[in-house]
Every structure is written in C-alpha cells, then in structure tokens.
C-alpha cells in the first residue's frame, strides 16, 4: 500500500496530538541533549507546537532568544517516528498562555499563569522526516511471499515541509 507524504504528515499530527510527548533539544547545543516535553497545539494549527517549561531549566537557559531546534517523536505504539526541525523561541503571550493552560500545566506552577518561573516556548516548524513502521507480522508475511522490503519501505517515509 502506498502512503503519500501528505498522509504521513496527517498521521504524524494525529499521533502527536494523542501522545503529546516528544524529545526536544537545541541544534548544536549541549552535545545534542534533548529532554521530554509535552506538545500542545493551538487548535488545528500545525505550524507551531507550544511547550510550557520553567525559566530555570537547562533548555530555557541555553535558548537565549531564538534558536534552531530539533524534536524526536515516537508514537506510543511505535508505528510512527519523526524528526521535526524548526525555530524555538520564548513567547509568554498572556492570551496564548490562557488558551493552552490546563490542570496538568497548573500542577507545575504554584503561581498559576503569572508564575515568575513560567516560560511558554514556541516551536515554529520548518520540516520533518517521518517514518511509518509497518506491522512486523505483516512485513514478515510479505517477505515470505517474495515482496522486496526496501521497495515497500520507500512508501513509508517522507520528508515534508511544515511551514
């Protein structure tokens, strides 16, 4: 079955909205250190991913103003993987904080939405490499029937523009 790049992109955002956790790091900083972050979206806008963090975290300290960043995502079922590139910046817009605020975020910030440690990160997406991991049982059956796994795999990966 052929999967188009647009279908892979749709699957990525559906999985990311469901699973919400990815590894985020700054390109060229701290030997590529990444840390788990909870991704949030402003409705159906898939051009930007938002993250709440504290100003005293290593990521926030290394960020400075705006920095190229990379995120790694693996769906809970390990049926989809992605590497996402973009620009990360601090954006403590009160309206966006209010829109994205929830009880899970509130648990981390005793001072609420105006906690002095609160930092909202904005990840403006540029591109992604997406891999779809076919069911191993199905892949095994296809190989037994003479299917070329490299040919089948070619339809399960794509590099897509996200901006």
Describe the residue ranges of each PLM region.
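A short, Trp-centered hydrophobic/proline-enriched beta-strand micro-motif
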Residues: 14-29, 69-73
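C-terminal edge-of-domain segments
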Residues: 116-163
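N-terminal leader/targeting segments and the immediate start of mature chains
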Residues: 1-21, 157-163
């Amino acid at each position: 079955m052929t999967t188009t790049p647009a279908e892979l992109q749709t699957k990525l955002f559906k999985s990311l909205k469901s699973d919400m956790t990815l590894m985020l790091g700054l390109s060229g900083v701290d030997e590529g250190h990444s840390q788990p972050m909870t991704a949030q979206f402003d409705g159906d806008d898939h051009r930007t991913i938002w993250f709440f963090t504290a100003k005293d975290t290593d990521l926030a300290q290394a960020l400075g103003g705006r920095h190229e960043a990379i995120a790694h995502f693996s769906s809970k079922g390990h049926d989809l993987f992605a590497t996402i590139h973009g620009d990360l910046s601090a954006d403590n817009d009160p309206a966006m904080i209010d829109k994205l605020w929830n009880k899970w975020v509130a648990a981390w910030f005793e001072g609420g939405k105006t906690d002095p440690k609160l930092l909202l990160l904005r990840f403006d997406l540029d591109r992604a490499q997406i891999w779809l991991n076919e069911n191993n049982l199905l892949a095994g059956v296809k190989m037994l029937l003479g299917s070329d796994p490299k040919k089948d795999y070619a339809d399960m990966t794509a590099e897509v523009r996200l901006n």
